[in-house]
Amino acid sequence: MDLAYLWFWIVGVLFVGYFVLDGFDFGVGMSLPFLGKDEVGKRQIINTIGPVWDFNETWLIVAGACLFAAYPEWYASLFSGFYLALLLILLALILRGVSFEYRPQREGLRWKKGFDTMIVIGSVLPALLWGVAVANLVQGVPLDENHEYTGSLLTLLNPYGLLGGITLVLVLFLHGLYFIGLKTDAQVHQDAKRLATRVGFITVVVAAAFLIWTIFIAAAHEAPLLPLVIAAAALAAVALLLSMFFHTKEREGWAFT
């Protein structure tokens, strides 16, 4: 294995680590409009990720640095072509971080609701745009002979890209609900379990559509790694179904894992 392949796997592992570890943070943020009927409940929800949310974002910084160091041309094409989408992600993450830090310091109900809204936006928007970006990388994006992106943000918002974004939002939302169910008790715990059951069924349907479409895209492109794509899709489907199975058995730790 030469260095190009080695760094490819390193960058891949770092991005996967980011989506897994910061992903459930996004899911917890998405849950605020649906869980926690009072300030005590919402505070309980936010406290589940209080010690870890900022550390988990370190994975993204390290992944971006490794991508720049190992594949500068790829980095340049990605960050110039997806500039607006990545800028929106960055702004959303800033809003989310500010809201986490300043929400406990403001006592007014209007301030609390405003910070809660920013947390939700800062959780949904990055998940949606990351899903759109990854789906477009799988599908392929228009590049010229200089490897410069020739499309726009609207080019990325194609049906397959949007389905990828919605799929990631639902998966991370479900992951966050499992985490809330694992870390809370009383009313918040029960509400999170009920909501996770409903969201789980929707996620299975949407994720199945996305995975099937992904296989068809790989087949249409005559991808040499088509068997690997099929195996990865099957593994993702099995993992999602197993998480729902463990959730129904009230084994929240296994469902979250």
Map each language-model feature to its residues.
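Transmembrane alpha-helical insertion/packing segments
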Residues: 47-69, 193-207
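Membrane-embedded alpha-helical segments in integral membrane proteins
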Residues: 8-9, 15, 62-74, 206-217
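The first (N-terminal) embedded transmembrane alpha-helix
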Residues: 22-23, 55-67, 127-133, 169
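Membrane-interface helix-loop-helix modules in multi-pass inner-membrane proteins
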Residues: 52-123, 144, 220-227
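Long, contiguous internal "core" modules enriched in hydrophobic/ aromatic residues
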Residues: 102-256
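Alpha-helical transmembrane segments
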Residues: 7-18, 79-93, 120-121, 155-171
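Membrane-water interface of transmembrane alpha-helices
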Residues: 21-22, 26-31, 90-103, 170-180
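N-terminal signal-anchor module of multipass membrane proteins
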Residues: 1-55, 61-64
